[in-house]
Curated annotation (Swiss-Prot):
Coiled coil: none annotated. One of its GO terms (cellular component) is extracellular space. Glycans are attached at N134. Belongs to the IL-10 family. Pfam families: IL10 (PF00726). It comes from Callithrix jacchus (White-tufted-ear marmoset). Major immune regulatory cytokine that acts on many cells of the immune system where it has profound anti-inflammatory functions, limiting excessive tissue disruption caused by inflammation. Mechanistically, IL10 binds to its heterotetrameric receptor comprising IL10RA and IL10RB leading to JAK1 and STAT2-mediated phosphorylation of STAT3. In turn, STAT3 translocates to the nucleus where it drives expression of anti-inflammatory mediators. This is Interleukin-10.
Length: 178
Protein backbone atom coordinates (compact mmCIF):
# COMPACT_ATOMS: atom_id res chain seq x y z
CA UNK A 1 0.00 0.00 0.00
CA UNK A 2 2.90 2.32 0.74
CA UNK A 3 4.24 2.04 -2.83
CA UNK A 4 0.81 2.77 -4.35
CA UNK A 5 0.48 5.90 -2.21
CA UNK A 6 3.95 6.98 -3.32
CA UNK A 7 3.06 6.35 -6.96
CA UNK A 8 -0.14 8.41 -6.64
CA UNK A 9 1.81 11.22 -5.03
CA UNK A 10 4.43 11.19 -7.80
CA UNK A 11 1.74 11.24 -10.50
CA UNK A 12 0.05 14.16 -8.73
CA UNK A 13 3.30 16.10 -8.35
CA UNK A 14 4.23 15.47 -11.99
CA UNK A 15 0.84 16.85 -13.03
CA UNK A 16 1.27 19.90 -10.82
CA UNK A 17 4.71 20.64 -12.27
CA UNK A 18 3.46 20.13 -15.82
CA UNK A 19 0.51 22.52 -15.41
CA UNK A 20 0.98 25.67 -17.48
CA UNK A 21 1.07 29.02 -15.74
CA UNK A 22 1.91 27.57 -12.36
CA UNK A 23 5.26 29.36 -12.00
CA UNK A 24 4.09 31.54 -9.14
CA UNK A 25 6.05 33.66 -6.73
CA UNK A 26 5.51 31.13 -3.93
CA UNK A 27 6.89 28.36 -6.15
CA UNK A 28 9.97 30.45 -6.84
CA UNK A 29 10.43 31.20 -3.15
CA UNK A 30 10.29 27.46 -2.52
CA UNK A 31 13.50 27.00 -4.48
CA UNK A 32 15.18 28.93 -1.67
CA UNK A 33 13.48 26.93 1.08
CA UNK A 34 16.39 24.54 1.82
CA UNK A 35 18.73 27.53 2.17
CA UNK A 36 16.34 29.36 4.49
CA UNK A 37 15.79 26.32 6.72
CA UNK A 38 18.76 27.03 9.06
CA UNK A 39 17.48 30.60 9.51
CA UNK A 40 13.94 29.42 10.34
CA UNK A 41 15.26 26.86 12.85
CA UNK A 42 17.49 29.53 14.40
CA UNK A 43 14.43 31.81 14.78
CA UNK A 44 12.58 29.00 16.57
CA UNK A 45 15.57 28.41 18.87
CA UNK A 46 15.93 32.11 19.69
CA UNK A 47 12.21 32.41 20.43
CA UNK A 48 12.36 29.30 22.62
CA UNK A 49 15.41 30.61 24.49
CA UNK A 50 13.17 33.38 25.90
CA UNK A 51 11.00 30.83 27.75
CA UNK A 52 13.33 27.86 28.10
CA UNK A 53 14.61 28.65 31.60
CA UNK A 54 11.10 29.33 32.91
CA UNK A 55 9.73 25.98 31.74
CA UNK A 56 12.81 23.93 32.55
CA UNK A 57 12.82 25.24 36.14
CA UNK A 58 9.15 24.28 36.48
CA UNK A 59 9.75 20.85 34.94
CA UNK A 60 10.22 18.61 37.98
CA UNK A 61 10.05 15.31 36.09
CA UNK A 62 13.11 13.15 35.48
CA UNK A 63 11.68 11.25 32.52
CA UNK A 64 12.03 12.34 28.89
CA UNK A 65 8.88 13.16 26.96
CA UNK A 66 10.39 13.46 23.48
CA UNK A 67 12.12 10.12 23.20
CA UNK A 68 14.32 8.58 20.53
CA UNK A 69 11.26 6.76 19.13
CA UNK A 70 9.87 10.12 18.01
CA UNK A 71 13.10 10.95 16.18
CA UNK A 72 12.96 7.51 14.55
CA UNK A 73 9.40 8.24 13.40
CA UNK A 74 10.60 11.55 11.97
CA UNK A 75 13.30 9.69 10.04
CA UNK A 76 10.98 6.86 8.94
CA UNK A 77 8.25 6.66 6.34
CA UNK A 78 5.83 8.35 8.78
CA UNK A 79 8.12 11.36 9.15
CA UNK A 80 5.74 13.72 7.39
CA UNK A 81 2.84 12.62 9.59
CA UNK A 82 4.87 12.71 12.82
CA UNK A 83 6.15 16.21 12.08
CA UNK A 84 2.72 17.49 11.13
CA UNK A 85 1.09 15.95 14.22
CA UNK A 86 3.74 17.31 16.58
CA UNK A 87 3.50 20.84 15.18
CA UNK A 88 -0.29 20.67 15.52
CA UNK A 89 0.04 19.25 19.06
CA UNK A 90 2.31 22.09 20.19
CA UNK A 91 0.17 24.77 18.50
CA UNK A 92 -3.24 23.51 19.62
CA UNK A 93 -2.62 21.82 22.97
CA UNK A 94 0.70 22.73 24.56
CA UNK A 95 1.26 26.42 23.76
CA UNK A 96 -2.27 27.68 24.51
CA UNK A 97 -1.99 26.16 28.00
CA UNK A 98 1.63 27.27 28.42
CA UNK A 99 0.63 30.90 27.73
CA UNK A 100 -1.65 30.84 30.78
CA UNK A 101 1.01 29.80 33.30
CA UNK A 102 2.60 33.21 33.81
CA UNK A 103 1.74 36.64 32.36
CA UNK A 104 5.46 37.44 32.00
CA UNK A 105 6.01 34.66 29.47
CA UNK A 106 2.69 34.81 27.60
CA UNK A 107 4.02 37.16 24.92
CA UNK A 108 7.14 35.04 24.39
CA UNK A 109 5.18 31.77 24.13
CA UNK A 110 2.81 33.49 21.70
CA UNK A 111 5.78 34.67 19.62
CA UNK A 112 7.20 31.14 19.58
CA UNK A 113 3.82 29.83 18.45
CA UNK A 114 3.65 32.39 15.64
CA UNK A 115 7.10 31.35 14.42
CA UNK A 116 6.03 27.69 14.49
CA UNK A 117 2.86 28.59 12.52
CA UNK A 118 4.98 30.42 9.94
CA UNK A 119 7.28 27.40 9.68
CA UNK A 120 4.27 25.09 9.19
CA UNK A 121 2.85 27.41 6.52
CA UNK A 122 6.14 27.39 4.59
CA UNK A 123 6.32 23.60 4.83
CA UNK A 124 2.78 23.27 3.48
CA UNK A 125 3.39 25.77 0.71
CA UNK A 126 6.74 24.42 -0.41
CA UNK A 127 6.64 20.70 0.33
CA UNK A 128 3.97 18.17 -0.45
CA UNK A 129 3.64 15.71 2.42
CA UNK A 130 3.17 12.11 1.43
CA UNK A 131 -0.26 10.84 2.41
CA UNK A 132 0.24 8.90 5.62
CA UNK A 133 -2.58 6.63 6.67
CA UNK A 134 -1.26 5.62 10.08
CA UNK A 135 -0.70 7.82 13.09
CA UNK A 136 2.74 7.95 14.61
CA UNK A 137 2.85 5.75 17.72
CA UNK A 138 5.53 7.99 19.22
CA UNK A 139 3.33 11.09 18.84
CA UNK A 140 0.40 9.26 20.44
CA UNK A 141 2.69 8.34 23.36
CA UNK A 142 3.80 11.97 23.78
CA UNK A 143 0.19 13.21 23.74
CA UNK A 144 -0.92 10.56 26.24
CA UNK A 145 1.98 11.35 28.58
CA UNK A 146 1.25 15.09 28.51
CA UNK A 147 -2.44 14.45 29.10
CA UNK A 148 -1.69 12.17 32.08
CA UNK A 149 0.75 14.64 33.60
CA UNK A 150 -1.70 17.55 33.20
CA UNK A 151 0.00 20.84 34.19
CA UNK A 152 3.35 19.11 34.71
CA UNK A 153 3.01 17.75 31.18
CA UNK A 154 2.82 21.26 29.76
CA UNK A 155 6.00 22.23 31.61
CA UNK A 156 7.66 19.06 30.35
CA UNK A 157 6.57 19.57 26.74
CA UNK A 158 7.66 23.21 26.72
CA UNK A 159 10.96 22.46 28.46
CA UNK A 160 11.80 19.95 25.71
CA UNK A 161 10.82 22.20 22.79
CA UNK A 162 14.50 22.51 21.82
CA UNK A 163 14.61 18.73 21.33
CA UNK A 164 11.57 19.07 19.06
CA UNK A 165 13.45 21.68 17.00
CA UNK A 166 16.41 19.28 16.74
CA UNK A 167 14.06 16.55 15.48
CA UNK A 168 12.57 18.94 12.92
CA UNK A 169 16.09 19.73 11.75
CA UNK A 170 16.97 16.03 11.45
CA UNK A 171 13.80 15.38 9.43
CA UNK A 172 14.30 18.36 7.12
CA UNK A 173 17.99 17.56 6.59
CA UNK A 174 17.10 13.99 5.66
CA UNK A 175 14.41 15.18 3.24
CA UNK A 176 16.74 17.75 1.65
CA UNK A 177 19.33 15.04 0.97
CA UNK A 178 16.80 12.75 -0.77
Amino acid sequence: MHSSALLCCLVFLTGVRASPGQGTQSENSCTHFPGSLPHMLRELRVAFSRVKTFFQKKDQLDSMLLKESLLEDFKGYLGCQALSEMIQFYLEEVMPQAENHDPDIKEHVNSLGEKLKTFRLRLRRCHRFLPCENKSKAVVQVKNAVSKLQEKGIYKAMSEFDIFIDYIEAYMTMKAQN
